[in-house]
Curated annotation (Swiss-Prot):
Name of protein: 2-oxoglutarate dehydrogenase E1 component
Subunit record text: Homodimer. Part of the 2-oxoglutarate dehydrogenase (OGDH) complex composed of E1 (2-oxoglutarate dehydrogenase), E2 (dihydrolipoamide succinyltransferase) and E3 (dihydrolipoamide dehydrogenase); the complex contains multiple copies of the three enzymatic components (E1, E2 and E3).
Keyword match Kinase: no
Gene behind this protein: sucA
CDD domains reported for this sequence: TPP_E1_OGDC_like
Amino acid sequence: MGEDFKKTGYLFGGNAVFVEELYKQYLANPASVDQTWQEFFAGIKDNNTLLNKSTAKIIIPDEIKKESLNNNLSSEDLNSLKAKEMINAYRKHAHYLANLDPLGLELRKTKNDLKLNIETFGLDSGQLEENINITDEFVGTWNCKLSELVTKFDKVYTGSIGVEFEQIENVAGKNWLYNKLESEVTFSSEDKKTILNDLVEVEGFEQYLHTKFPGAKRFSIEGGDASIVAMSKAIDLSMHQGVSEIVIGMAHRGRLNTLTKVVGKPYKAVIADFISGSVFPDELNVSGDVKYHLGYSSDRTLEDKKIHLSLADNPSHLEAVNPIVAGKVRAKQDILGDTKRSKVKAILVHGDAAFCGQGVVAESLSMSPLAAYDIGGILHFVINNQLGFTANAADTRASRYSTEFAKIIAAPILHVNGDDIEAVLKATNIAVEYRQKFGKDVVVEIICYRKYGHNEGDEPMYTQGKMYNIIKNKLTPGNIYANELVKSGVIDNNYFAKLKEEFKAKLDKEYEQAKSYKQEAHFLGGLWQGISRTRTQATITGISKKTLHDLGTKLCEIPKDFAVNPKLVKLFEARKATLTADQPIDWATAEQLAFASLLASGTNIRLTGQDSGRGTFSHRHSVLHNQIDGTTYIPLNNLSKEQAKYEVADSNLSEYAVLGFEYGYSLANPKNLVLWEAQFGDFANGAQIIFDQFISSSETKWLRMSGLVVLLPHAFEGQGPEHSSARLERFLQLAAENNMYVTYPTTPASIFHLLRRQILDDTRKPLIVMSPKSLLRHKYAVSKLDELGENTTFLPVLDEVTKVDTNNITKVILCSGKVYYDLFEMRGNNSNIAIIRLEQLYPFEKKLVASLLKKYNRTQEFIWCQEEPKNMGTWCYIVSHLNDALKEAGIKNEFKYVGREESASPAVGSLQVHNKQQEKLLRTALGI
């Protein structure tokens, strides 16, 4: 509100949003606005009034303004208009005046700085006792003295809460928020005592751990105590609004208090973690994780209501858990048929530096309103302790607030002083109601401080001496509130001390019980009952040929009145003809048959990824688009009335958040088949944190299993270093302890069985698939229906396909993926070379490989052939396994490597060079 504002006057400046909106409303229907406004707008000559379409601002010459105001408005109406503009200015800008910093380090602006004094709006001190009468759909109804109005708005907007709502496009939602904020909230004496008790327990538990286990890392929430109370209050409010389940995601700070105070983990269980150092029973033989990464779930009851609470496990990688929580919530909503997204909700707790520093925050926020990822809004708490480890706020962001990312989705933001617990709870109440009423994200930023260093063993005085000199002499939030209650007569001087003594006694009892407490493993319950951590037997995944024919034919049916692209008509006719003639099928058909068979038996399927509806390589076409009206038709959802649901969506251009969301979705129900597909496998490393910290390790760290399928197009076809490699070697490096399947299938039958195995198996492991590109249309990359038929199963190793005399074999080549077909075609009729394929690389089937190699015990040369450079692909992982298999087969020999030389880049950029390299490695492998 600078010079431009003063030039354009108090009414029609850039801040007069309500006038602009009212004017547009008047143009649409004059009778829809107040009579005074009708006269005012009618008094403006049309040829002198412009509505700038690009900015949606009213442009009215000054002389017209003055003439219209003088002719059409009484002094009372004019003062009301001025007061309206003042109200709007407060709403937009007064957050800069709010008392948000409990440490008082910030130099606050004044009303004069922001031009929020009454003189700016054409009012003066002589009018303070005049009555203001406002009835307006935008600013509400006000009938009071001007002085009372100013006092009211000073209290609301320049106190302990500062708000940013102007980014909200929904006028109804924005007005609702302002009205809620401007409404008084009162707490009864009993409410106040309960709040004080909550603060005592939050601080008391932290101090108890600090005393009993000095120096142990716990990432105390002290200084931000209000955040724990706010979370707990949000849950109680949600229960009253009909929410039946909440999933919480957060980082390490304050987690131990969240586990106990909010989620309901027994204090003795957390204390036992400190005493024993073990978080899971030893007999499970898992790595476990540090105590401040662990999740927990329980039920909370309030009066006659019950809610299920889950705190998601997470790593130290800040904000990584955000999309996982969202995906899990969406899955639970889908299980309940909660299409209104009102029964299950998410709460995410962020740190200030992480919220504005981690890209996954922006990715997750951007995807949240999209149909495939919408969960009806998330309640966000940002715990702003004004530091990022040792970095000051100025080092971690350029913006005033840490919450700017939230404006990507026009989320309302409430900033609140963490020392004012009642203000924190008022903001929380508004946020909870807003999320439930409007189904949108909302952010509550609690500005607080961190009592200790980043952890309890860290010395913050090295880098923040000024700040910590203030903190060490500061009253805690609990003490501040207790003093307020004593002053107001709610409690006496002894009440606070008694609360602390009683809670300390409770913790002493919990400590004694913790000494003999046996850790429990809470997993494989609910929908996961019947799932095993290990496979008990090979799973038959084939189905009858009749079923394959019936499903395949149904998939090829297109409604007569649906104007599909003519090329797709031919494609579907060709698929149908192939099935009818019992001819070998391609990859896309096999995938669709796997999906269809699972849907028919009641398994819901969810597939997302960039371009997944059609498929990057135009092979899937599971969503048909009407060429005339743009409507869609999904054959997989039109198999029968009794079938399960097939959900396919083209994701936003994100790997990290989208993969995280699908991983989270897979955690909720093991009976769902959940898939994420990369556009090219090369881009999967944009989600490396999800692979490293969750998919590969969540079972051993947190006892969390997942059956997620990851499809990564991978093959060296001359498309350059960014469209060739899914970095297969990285997945093999992550593979251990039977934590996942890593596969590089070459046949349609293999993908058919792999997909079905994910559901029919009695265990759940992530499935990593190096999926094909050119093989999607390769003449040899086909499978007979018999290979998908009854009593068939996935074959992790495929022997030489031609009939050979093993006594004549002079060379055995093992390989995986597309290079097999290159070798097969170049070999031709050479009957002295056998080629064996590994369809599954991990777990390595040593006994099966050894049994095949034993047939070739007279062979002198064993080769591993791959397209990838030697330092990439499979070689480094598999060489020891292959040689062990040779030993088990009784063959005294070792495998030799044939492939590209070591390289810093996965592939060359030149097609010509690629072709030369490919021919060289093929000829070397075949010895021609």
